[in-house]
Design a protein with these regions (language model features):
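Pocket-forming structural segment of enzyme catalytic cores
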Residues: 57, 75-147, 158-164
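Flexible gly/pro-rich beta->alpha loop and the following alpha-helix that scaffold active-site loops
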Residues: 1-62, 75-76, 80
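Glycine-rich nucleotide phosphate-binding loop and flanking beta-alpha elements
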Residues: 23-25, 68, 123
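Conserved G/P- and acidic residue-centered "switch" motifs that form tight phosphate/ATP-binding loops
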Residues: 65
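C-terminal active-site "lid" helix and adjoining low-complexity regulatory extension at the edge
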Residues: 166-168
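Active-site phosphate/pyrophosphate-handling residues
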Residues: 49, 69, 121
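Structured adenosyl-cofactor binding patch, chiefly the S-adenosyl-L-methionine
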Residues: 72
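Active-site-proximal beta-strand elements of phosphoester/diester hydrolases
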Residues: 152-156
């Protein structure tokens, strides 16, 4: 897939969205697989390839859920492979409050926000240049921004929030 015309064509886009999905291969962040599931090695490779291209050109990138995790691994960070209490319950997203540090994210949404949670993994050690700007009450990183690149990641799914952020 790395040589596919689709990936080469995607690099011409103005921005990159890294969506949610299965877990990244733990070997990509130096760990053995202890709790990762739904692995898609070809997807990992394709997203990391695209991310490298967009970073080289300093184009905007937004990572959502798995996308935040891909960003963190790309910049040399690690992941918590299994995080109890953050995955969906009975097929529905959990809701919880987060606190946001002074940042463009706080400018958009304020100091506290109720977000959804549908993940069982999260950022552990942050990658180079990434700064945590939002946390769950238990300390789980819920959003990051890069210190010098137009790169943001959120652990929650803004596209599934009800209320003013929702398109429905």
């Amino acid at each position: 897939p790395l040589a596919s015309p689709d990936l080469r064509d995607a690099v011409r886009c103005a921005a990159l969205l890294l969506p949610g999905g299965g877990d990244m291969e733990p070997r990509r962040y130096g760990q053995a697989n202890t709790a990762s599931r739904g692995l898609e090695p070809e997807r990992d490779a394709g997203e990391l390839f695209l991310l490298e291209q967009f970073i080289m050109e300093k184009k905007p990138v937004l990572g959502i859920c798995r996308g935040l995790q891909v960003l963190n691994v790309f910049f040399g960070g690690t992941l918590i492979q299994d995080l109890p209490g953050h995955s969906q319950a009975a097929g529905r997203d959990r809701l919880h409050r987060v606190r946001t540090a002074p940042s463009p994210l706080q400018d958009l949404f304020g100091e506290t926000l109720v977000v959804n949670s549908a993940h069982h993994q999260a950022a552990d050690r942050l990658g180079q240049g990434l700064r945590a700007v939002q946390w769950a009450i238990d300390g789980t990183v819920e959003a990051v921004i890069h210190q010098s690149l137009p790169v943001w990641g959120v652990q929650w799914h803004p596209e599934r929030l009800a209320g003013p952020l929702s398109l429905s």
